[in-house]
Each structure stands twice: as structure tokens, then as C-alpha cells.
Amino acid sequence: MKFKHKSVLLHETIDNLNPKDDGLYVDATFGGGGHARYLLSKLNRGTVIGFDQDEYAISMAKESFAEELKPGAEPKLILVHDNFCHLKENLVELGISDGIDGIYYDLGVSSPQFDQPERGFSYRFDARLDMRMDQSQELDAYTIVNTWSQKELSDILYKYGDEKFSRQIARKIVDRRREKPIVTTFDLVDVIKDAIPAYARRSGGHPAKKSFQAIRVAVNNELGVLQESLEEAIKLLKPGGRISVITFQSHEDKIVKKIFKKYSEVEIPRGMPMIPADSKPTLRLISRKPIMASSDELEENNRSHSAKLRVAEKL
């Protein structure tokens, strides 16, 4: 299977990095490599380091970017099979210690991951509950659904999925698993449908969409690793280097917005009448409001409707 994932906000994400001919850039979420391919076309002697924790994505990238991965290639691509929360240690291992010129994140889940039934991401295919981006980790969707407490389940469904029937769904999950384990995606879909009132199932898309999203976020600790990675990325940027982040969910965007605000504003310490002279912001926001997809892209790519791009520059 080949990646059919269509990159969202492609030009906006890369062009806002102000790519330098010989720059060093990090693609924190390589996926199908759409953003990386466009960035490589902008470089001459530069390097792109692509991170992905999904072994399948890395194996596909080795095929589709064979030329750029060859020793001595210019521009050069380096692939790293790891989570983007381990940026610094991997860069040090590669001998990079003087910073990077730019980094970007596309936080959408790649379409092929949903299209592989055995990955257990999708409510459209019947498969064992899994949802792990990194297939080597122990925690999976089956474990969460069958062992977490009713309160824990309710909390993640509400917090990560904005599911207003979170309590009803959590209660139904616990009741059902007392009878027998909830093993497959379709088992879980049936439980969710039973928990949601009939009137609510008739509108708003698939009734399991929000719950599946929430469980996926919990399985992969997506918000925790995002916050950790963004903090590290900002420290790794050289002065003038830029960071671009595409989000698709409100909880992701809130984290990006909060961290960008933290580093672009200087707080007056309590008890002091003014900002100390040596206190300076670390980032400059490229745009106060998030960059959204153009009308043309909205027509061509349905995924772009919820996409928000935020960009900042290291001072």
C-alpha cells in the first residue's frame, strides 16, 4: 500500500519557514513526506531530518525517497524512526549540536493508517482494538477500553473527543466488558451506538468518531508528547529559525497557542512595577491568528477544513 495522504497547507507551512539554501530542517511528522518533498525542492545543499514513530511510514519513505537518502545526496534526507518528543537526543546522535534552521509539525493522522484495518484506528473496518502509532509500545486501545476505570474513560472521551455523551458511553463500556471483553473496533462501535440516544445518532457524522479520536489520543499520549516536543523544538532553533505547526483538533491548537504565547510574551514578575531590562521574549509570532486553508484547497481537500497553521520565529 502506498501513501495517498494529501498534504494540507503545503506551501503555507514550508514557505513560512523561509527556507535557506543550505539550511537544516526537521520534519517532526514525516508521514507520506509531502511537506518534506516540497521543502527539499527549495534546498540546494540543505538537509531535512524526518521523524516518524510509525515503522510503516519509515519503510514507505525509504522507497519513495531513495535518491534523497543516498550517501552524498544534495539536498539530503535523513530518516529517524522515533517519536518527535525525542528530538534532541536523536539530533545529538547525528552529530548536530549547533541548532536547526526550522521545524514543522503536521498533527493529522495519515490516511493509510486508517486504511490499514489491522491497525485498529478506524470505526470503518473490523479489527482488533489497537490504535498504536508506535507498534512496539505496550499500551493499546484494547487495554484502555477493557481495564481503565469508568471515570478515566469518561474523562478522556470528554477531554480529548469533546464527546457530550462521555459518561453514558463510559458506563456502557464498563457494563459490556463485565459480560465479555470488548475486543474489536466493531465491538466498540456497537457499545457506543447503544449508549448514544437515537436522536443524536441521526446527525453529526458517525456516532463513534469522537470516541475513537479520544481513545487514539490517549493511547499515543498525543497531547503530552506534543507539549514536550514543542518546548524542546523552540530551544533547538537557531536565532531566525522558524517553527510551523498544523493542528486539526481544538485541544492541539490550544497547546500550540499557549506555548507560542508563553515564549512570545514577557510576564512582569509579581511585585515588580515593570519588565526587567534583561527580560526578552524568545519567539516572534509570524501571524497573530492561525493561517487557514484557501478556498481552492478547501474544495480539493476535505481534511483542510479543520486545519490551523501557527508559525513563530526564534529571536
Curated annotation (Swiss-Prot):
Protein keywords: Cytoplasm, Methyltransferase, rRNA processing, S-adenosyl-L-methionine, Transferase
Q: Where in the cell is it found?
A: Cytoplasm
In the record, biological process GO terms are: rRNA base methylation
Catalytic activity reads: cytidine(1402) in 16S rRNA + S-adenosyl-L-methionine = N(4)-methylcytidine(1402) in 16S rRNA + S-adenosyl-L-homocysteine + H(+)
Q: What highest taxon heads this organism's lineage?
A: Bacteria
Residues annotated for S-adenosyl-L-methionine binding in this entry: 33-35, 52, 84, 106, 113
User: Which one of the record's GO molecular function terms can you name?
Assistant: rRNA (cytosine-N4-)-methyltransferase activity
Q: What is its EC number?
A: 2.1.1.199
Q: What is its main location?
A: cytoplasm
Which InterPro entries has this protein been placed in? RsmH, SAM-dep_MeTrfase_MraW_recog, SAM-dependent_MTases_sf
Keyword Nucleus appears in the UniProt entry: no
UniProt-listed Pfam families? Methyltransf_5 (PF01795)
Q: Name one GO cellular component term.
A: cytoplasm
- Residue segments, region Disordered: 295-315
**By its UniProt entry, which NCBIfam families does this protein fall under?**
16S rRNA (cytosine(1402)-N(4))-methyltransferase RsmH
Identify its protein family: Belongs to the methyltransferase superfamily. RsmH family.
Role of this protein: Specifically methylates the N4 position of cytidine in position 1402 (C1402) of 16S rRNA.
Q: What is this protein called?
A: Ribosomal RNA small subunit methyltransferase H
Which taxonomic lineage does the organism of this UniProt entry have? Bacteria, Bacillati, Bacillota, Bacilli, Lactobacillales
